[in-house]
Swiss-Prot record:
The gene is aroC. GO terms for molecular function: chorismate synthase activity; FMN binding. This reaction introduces a second double bond into the aromatic ring system. It comes from Corynebacterium diphtheriae (strain ATCC 700971 / NCTC 13129 / Biotype gravis). Its EC number is 4.2.3.5. This is Chorismate synthase. Reduced FMN (FMNH(2)).
Length: 403
């Protein structure tokens, strides 16, 4: 089974992504990974770090001459700020009697962070892991970690492109109270235009409103959340299964997207809106079109009973406003127990545009795993043969003489 994990901290030396059981023969390059990481840095409302953050990519294993070789893939994303943090984030024990070490630890960066931020992992993490400050928690819970997931997912994207000829893309549905017209339905061909939008919106009208909302929040010392939609066209029927809860593709997608920092809700297709409809209005009727089984609509978002049904996959993720609010919220100092305001770290006003790119990454990883579970293969060529045979079967299964 395809597996992935990451290691590293926000201000550590580097982030590491590990990807296991990817078949041999999948094309991948540092340039392609860097391109996706660059997309992750996009977006109006991002903080100062995005202006100088350069993701230095190194492929440490699992790839030779531009192709995966079947062994575990290790990708390192270097941190350009590391020289400023070598003492504070040192993996080795430090000697605080050393003048240089003492100076670093008494600096602004080295200050103990004892005032947890509401909405962040700080408080629960300090208690759970018995830390006397929040630094060990916020370093790992930071959304900087998603850079490693985007790197790993670049391999999954290439695998999906080579095996199924599909692309994973996203756009921003809403930021704050601004949202696009629900009739807007972009395709992968629109991605360049979407990425050129400061807020990654497919609607110029909505874009202007979203930018206004972000500017207003920034002026007020506040932050904003929003909703992104990920779309994949051309998936085969039958990825995932109804057999058990953990096999359901929608459950896997929801778990993966909820695992992104600040994501608080996920819906497949029309999702929550379906709960407000009558049954006769909620489901996608099955018809024959040119002798082939087809659907009248796609309210289900391409998944029924935990399996892809041949329609476009549509999944949305709701991101809460960033927890590090410049206008600091009320908190408690965990040293003294006295009232305080939450610590303030450099952060974004709005990271919804970037969240779309991270959501793409998680969808790509889950889909790549589902493809390998369905079709297997130790090499790309073997997987493609298996898919081709299945596609021939499906053609005969859904074709009928008739209307």
């Amino acid at each position: 089974m395809l597996r992935w994990t990451t290691a590293g901290e926000s201000h550590g030396q580097a982030l590491i992504a590990m990807l296991e059981h990817m078949p041999a023969g999948v094309p991948i390059s540092r340039e392609e990974i860097s391109f996706q990481l660059g997309r992750r840095r996009l977006g109006f409302g991002r903080g100062a770090r995005m202006k100088f953050e350069a993701d230095e990519v190194s492929i440490l294993g699992g790839v030779r001459h531009g192709y995966t070789i079947g062994s575990p893939i290790a990708i390192m994303v270097g941190n350009t700020e590391w020289p400023k943090w070598t003492t504070i984030m040192s993996a080795d024990a430090i000697d605080e009697s050393d003048p240089d070490v003492a100076a670093a630890m008494s600096s602004g960066r080295g200050a103990r962070l004892t005032r947890p931020r509401p909405g962040h992992a700080d408080f629960a993490g300090m208690v759970k892991y018995n830390h006397d400050e929040a630094r060990p928690i916020l370093e790992r819970s930071s959304a900087r970690e998603t850079a490693a997931r985007v790197a790993a997912a670049t391999v999954a994207r290439s695998f999906l492109r080579e095996t199924l000829g599909v692309e994973v893309f996203s756009h921003v549905i809403s930021i704050g109270r601004s949202e696009i017209d629900q009739t807007v339905c972009p395709t992968f061909e629109d991605l360049g235009r979407i990425d050129d939008s400061p807020v990654r919106s497919a609607s110029a009208q909505a874009e202007a409103s979203m930018i206004d909302q972000i500017n207003a929040a920034k002026k007020q010392g506040d932050t904003l959340g929003g909703i992104v939609e990920v779309i994949v066209n051309g998936l085969p029927i039958g990825l995932g299964s109804h057999i058990s809860g953990e096999d359901r593709l929608d459950a896997q997608l929801a778990a993966a997207l909820m695992g992104i920092q600040a994501i608080k809700g996920v819906e497949i297709g029309d999702g929550f809106e379906e709960a407000r409809r009558l049954g006769s209005e909620a489901h996608d009727e099955i018809v024959l079109r040119d002798g082939v089984v087809a659907r009248q609509s796609n309210r289900a978002g391409g998944i029924e009973g935990g399996m892809t049904n041949g329609e476009s996959l549509r999944v949305r993720a709701a991101m809460k406003p960033i927890s590090t609010v410049p206008r600091a919220l009320q908190s408690i100092d965990m040293d003294s127990g006295k009232r305080a305001t939450g610590i303030h770290q450099r952060s974004d006003v709005c990271a919804v545009p970037a969240a779309g790119v991270v959501a793409e990454a998680m969808v790509a990883l889950v889909l790549a795993r589902a493809v390998l579970e369905k079709f297997g293969g130790d090499s790309l060529a073997e997987t493609k043969r298996n898919i081709a045979a299945y596609n021939e079967y499906v053609k005969t299964r859904i074709a009928f003489d008739g209307e």
